[in-house]
Amino acid sequence: LTYSCDLYVNVRIITYIYNQSENHIETKTKKLKDIYIGKLPVMVGSKACILSIIPHENILSECRYDMGGYFIVNGNEKVLINQDRIKENYVLIFKPANNIDIIHTEIRSMNEPLYLPTKTISLSMSKKSNHMGRVIRINTSFLKTEIPVFIMFRALNILSDYEIIHHILYDVNKLKNKHILEELKACCDDAIGVYTREDALEYILRNITGNMRNNKTVENVEMVLDSDLLPHITGRNKKALYLGFMINKAISIYLGYESYDNRDSYINKRIDTPGMLMSNLFRQCYGKITKELKSMIEKDINQWGNDSTSVVDLISDKQHITKYFKQGLLDSWLKYALSTGNWGIKTIGSFQNIKQGVSQVLNRMCHH
């Protein structure tokens, strides 16, 4: 027995049909309502629970002292344990755990209105120095290795050393900023040979992660910079200013003007309650469902070949599109997480992003 509710979605299908003879693109839009995609476990006593709409005195066969707040999965009562996490959209600087760097700056950036996964951007100052001093390099989720920060500035169309330094220091005449300026000389030298935006984009293109190699173009790099580099900030100049702020703060701590952040302090943390935990898990499940949906549609398109009309009719058919949403996938993933406490979806050969012990059996022991 699992206490759950059916989940239906409305699907909007936008089809672009290219007429080669007339060099014209025709757009068709169709809406399909109430497509079943799976079941969602319901928390007892929540707004989705039947008990929430029944007056308390009329509830039958339910203990009047039962406060709810648990899930029923495979006949077992499960509760979710609140989880803490590092807060998003805030620059934090810690003492590095390795012996390679002396400063580690990190921000977990998230576009909150869209509720997309966080993108981690980190800066590191190496213990090793070149002939000019210690360099600062940047790493992100779409790069396979660290790159010089000045190259990232030039990819954001901040080209000259003077412009970059202005984005970092704002006022060069301050005594503190003069000391920071001395530390930036090595960063200028680290980006030697890359002076234009085109060169910077090509440099990033050569260092982009493997899962983006199918779209390895300069245009794709520009799109990635807009969407994955500090996604909570819009506009390349604003992104460059924020990157400059991160560098300024990192060097200020290195020079002793500011102190390190405390990783264990709850000032720098946020708490995920059951609603947020279920939302994050559902987001992962839904992302995997859409990936499988995409691959199945591409398979049908390749199978039907040039018969575009048949493909459009096939995809737009309500009965057929229901087959794209494999029945039981969403149910099994959510039930597995609630049953085992392993929170997250396993990627191929990796449990890296899975938390353990999130779900536990409700203790009904009486202390009287």
Language-model features: locations:
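N-terminal non-catalytic structural scaffold regions of very large proteins
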Residues: 1-368
